[in-house]
């Protein structure tokens, strides 16, 4: 969180932009971990999930090439859509209980923070590089919400895997 703290302690536009980039680098990396965690849980409970469900968790899309070979290509799912999909997929397993609230202001802040990140990373003009205090507050709120989300989902999928492992011990 030091990039965020540094951005709030200074009015430097460069520090603010670096903080936005750092937050989303963390979120992107963490989301890959969370998705793979849910994929492990889903793979252990395969009877609850369709092949499409498992493909989405692996971010793969099957296709047939011009020679008739079945192949897969990478599927890029936007972060907000991916979060919703992970929650729906976890809900298929009643053992993997979570308490994630998509009506929480932090989730809405995440959607706004993604717009801010996109504006900073792909500016259409120099003005789009300017970040207000409100922008930084939204990014901080998004970071906090995502961190709580990742911890809750990881815990839920861990619990589901632990329940399955314990069922084999009986």
What are these regions (language model features)?
Residues 9-21, 104-111, 130-133:
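Short, solvent-exposed segments of well-ordered alpha helices
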